[in-house]
């Protein structure tokens, strides 16, 4: 079993409210480093939840901080891409900025989500920034579950020859039996 470690010190600590502390000043790189030292065969990267509920006024800065930690861990020899939970973005973060920040081997989960700004432009076409990220080697994960996923969005993407690189589930307490 492999795992991505949430950059928030307390992780996702509730069922429906996402109370992660995404203030980069509160990220504990020292603790993250010690966990990578202790579990190098298990930890495969860092996770940042990019949605309105967790970002607040921090905008894209939690992602930048996560990428910086990832670079430090890579310099120490650890495998450490960044995976993001892409969802209902706040107004101060755009899909263009988000997808443009991601690097080769990073992962964008919930690529077919329907909340706020999606991967589609106003005409239903995949945005150029999404294609650009995919061409750079950013992995697109459908991460399907009960929420954060849409069959019509999947069909629209497939009709444009846009396919996920990863097909995974999103099993949480509210979706495991639905």
Report each predicted region and the residues it spans.
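Divalent metal-binding pocket/active-site signature
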Residues: 47-127, 144-149
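A short acidic, helix-capping loop that chelates divalent metal ions and anchors anionic groups
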Residues: 11-15, 54, 116-117, 176-177
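Divalent-metal coordination cores built from histidine and acidic residues
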Residues: 1-50
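Short amphipathic alpha-helices and their capping/turn segments at secondary-structure boundaries
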Residues: 29-38, 93-102, 154-160
């Amino acid at each position: 079993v492999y795992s991505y470690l949430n950059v928030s010190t307390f992780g996702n600590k509730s069922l429906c409210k996402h109370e992660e502390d995404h203030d980069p000043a509160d990220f504990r790189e020292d603790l993250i480093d010690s966990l990578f030292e202790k579990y190098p065969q298990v930890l495969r990267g860092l996770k940042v939840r990019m949605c309105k509920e967790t970002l607040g006024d921090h905008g894209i800065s939690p992602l930048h901080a996560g990428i910086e930690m990832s670079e430090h861990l890579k310099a120490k020899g650890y495998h450490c891409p960044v995976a993001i939970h892409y969802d209902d973005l706040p107004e101060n973060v755009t899909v263009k900025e988000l997808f443009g920040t991601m690097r080769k081997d990073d992962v964008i989960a919930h690529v077919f989500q329907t909340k706020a700004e999606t991967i589609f432009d106003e005409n239903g076409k995949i945005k150029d920034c999404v294609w650009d990220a995919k061409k750079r080697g950013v992995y697109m994960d459908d991460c399907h579950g009960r929420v954060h996923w849409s069959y019509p969005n999947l069909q629209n993407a497939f009709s444009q020859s846009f396919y996920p690189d990863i097909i995974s589930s999103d099993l949480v307490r509210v979706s495991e039996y639905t």
